[in-house]
């Protein structure tokens, strides 16, 4: 079977039962596919179903219409294992938005968070929204960066994703429209090989309310993907990209496997692969790793 459907439920939920698997097989067969055997990647959590004779677009539509209640991702089986991970940081590798947490120390978190939400949904120009939010932090002590970092939590599966891919020879890159203070911390703690982000301009131990130009925007993420794959001697088809915001869309679209992870509505409308139930270990299941293969 040259194609594979991967079904993924929330971790440790035991929500993926034989009934859902049987329904998925029936949906594929009814759409005209030849359906193969089931390979369990994690009991009650993730499995592969091989199939052939059906386009991915038709399979995706049929599975989406079926409303299985789990993540259902189709792809070509032969090329699923990737050699490079390129990941967004905010609301992807970490659960929140680092700029919003920083804004809390200036008493403007709600205002900044509202702008962030609109920008990440593609409703506002990214650079203009970034400048406006950073401008509200003018005069803040740089000591607050460390305080904001204390409020940040890693997304479930983040460390396992990076460690497992690296143990299997992949290169791991963190590329964010956030700030290098935070991406540096994430790189060190999770084991990323590389990080790139925006730079807050400081003077005399205080934020100036400005960010170094040019900003790292959606095009910069695409440029990073192309540069990193070239440096590794591989193609963009050998990369798996993950993000949640509008500024991740081009990167997600270009990578061999592009994942919208618990993403904003506008992003989910355009991305082919969406993960809404699983945590970041879903990206390992998508590549054919079984839970027993995970490096914790």
Spell out what each predicted region is:
Residues 83-85, 117, 239:
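Residue-level marker of motif borders
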